[in-house]
Amino acid sequence: MRKIIIFDLDNTFYNYENSHSAALNAVFSSQKEFDDYEKFFIKYEETKKKVQKRLLGNPSRHSKLIYFKELFHEKIDLQKIYELESIYWESFINSTEIDKETVNLLSNKKGSSDLYYLFTNQNTNIQLKKINTWGLDFFDLVITSEEVGFEKPDHNFFNYADNFIADYTNKKDSKIYSIGDDYRNDIKFWQEKYSSNSYLIDNNMSESKF
């Protein structure tokens, strides 16, 4: 029987907080407006909350470029703001530790008819950079909240993603699996609709069994 495995990316294949912390430290070291990291971090968090409240439900609410643009408003020029966002993501991606054994396991476990789908919140450009840099080249389909216009767990996101799954399940020749770090975002919809075998994990894919 065909396996359709629905993955999340962030904080599923790696520890998000470790990568984010390394990236913020790199940004702090590359600017001169703040001379104390704690003050910089507090101001960053305040800015992030303000942006996310304003853009509630909009996938752009996670944009680091928007955060930095507001954080450094009238302090540095736009070119420098753009550079800081690039520094953030370069550091984030390069500092992330991906378990190679996990990647090899997933690649080796994938049968010829199996499908690996990645459904993720975030910017499409950044998510593709992550999976390409980290060697996660086994996905048959990648869908981001940016291209859908809604974030998980919004039902509009799941309804769009489900279009790519329903045809297979209607043939009754497929089994659905869902894997992620957040029940509402990654598992609940698929479990309720397809009785998916689900794995709620904490940055350790080796705990999952197929």
Functional labels for PLM-detected ranges:
Residues M1-K3, V103, S107, Q122-F210:
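Asp-based, Mg2+/Mn2+-dependent phosphohydrolase catalytic module
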Residues K32-E46, H73-S86, F138-F139, Y168-S174:
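Short, surface-exposed acidic
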